Each structure stands twice: as structure tokens, then as C-alpha cells.
Amino acid sequence: MSELNTTIRWKPQSTGTGRFGKWLENLNDWNLSRSRFWGTPLPIWRSETGEEKCIESIQQLYDEIELSVKAGNMSSNPLKEKGFVPGDYSDENYHKIDLHRPYVDNIILTSETGKPMKRELDLMDVWFDSGSMPFAQIHYPFENRDQIDKNLSFPADFIAEGVDQTRGWFFTLHAIATMIRDSVAYKAVVSNGLVLDKNGNKMSKHLGNAVDPFGVIEKYGIDPVRWYMMTNSSPWDNLKFDEAG
């Protein structure tokens, strides 16, 4: 990941070599699991004896449920009951099912030795969802493979976000693209600075130093506010907002 990072054009460059680069150099293992209710379920089923199955697609899940019905560990296939057809990627078909909790937790699979298997109750870190965006948005690898495999829509020409995303979106995009494609997820980054109060502190309702942007726009007009934002700092630097000028 560090090697691939050297090919990305960062603006400012110091964020790529400094904040982001140092983060990669001192990277710890990414713990993907989260003990939550809302989110993407981990597709891992385990038996009480430690056997595991990691499900890679809904087609595989459908087939595993069919095997579990035959083994007597499930009375019926809930996907089949709802009229879901594997391989039909239409919205109409996918709206028939919901594989979030609690529904997915009711699916019991069967191990190679015939033991019932229950799903690992934890969820995936929501940042995994965010970092999967280049692939998930086009349903890769199940559809539109050329978009990724032939680099028609990947990697992105550039992305732009706040500097606080070096450990969030910038990192998860980079990590997942490296794992899946040994590639960068984006060719360039515009790392925006943050809007702070006039003393350089983070705006907070608790501190009472937050500025209502709609009130400022209503008072001065949108173009003067834009001009103020553009001329008082570079896009990648933090801006100390002071209504006095």
C-alpha cells in the first residue's frame, strides 16, 4: 500500500507523504467486525464444533440453504418462498429479500459433517462499505466486469474530501483496491481543509462557536460568502472563519 501511495498525486503533497504516508507505514491490522445491529452482516457461519463457511454470493447462500433444507436443519428456503431468483439482478427481484439482521440470523446452514451452523452475529465495519464503493456501485464482480478489469471506470481520476478522511475513506478505498486489484483506487486526491472558528478551534454546538452557514448566506449573499471562502485560504488549508473579515 505504501508503494502504491507514491503513485498518487496528492494536493497538498504533504498529506500524502506525511499524514497518510505515516499512517500506512505504521498500519495495524484492520479489525473488520463490529458489535452492532444495523449494518452489513458478516457472511460467516459457524458450527458449535468450530466448522466455518464464508459465503461469497447470494447464489451460494441460496444453494447452501437448499442443502440445509435437505439435511433437516431448515424447514424451507426463505429466499425461494419470497420468489427470489438467483442470477436475476433486477431491482424488482432484490426487493423481495432482506439479508440484514434479524432476518439473516434466522438462516441455519449445514456443515460438512451435518452440524447446524449459525451466523456470526457481528457486522462489518461501515468503512468497509465505503471503501468498497468503486466495486459495489456497479455490482462487481457479478456484473460489469469490464468496467474494472479493463479500467474503464477504475481507478477514479480524483477524489476530494476533508483531511480527516486520511484514516477513513482515503484509507479504506486504498486498502480494498490494493487487496482486490493490487491497484490504487484513485489517481489523485484533493484533500480539503476544515472550516474552524476565528480562533482556529473546531466548531461545536457544545462550545457554542458554530456558525450557521444559512444565516451568513442570507445576510451577505452566496457569492460574497464564496469569495470569502476562496480568498482567505487555499482549498487544502484550514480556514479560520471570522464574520468580521
Segments from the language model and where they lie:
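Structured secondary-structure scaffolds
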Residues: M1-G245
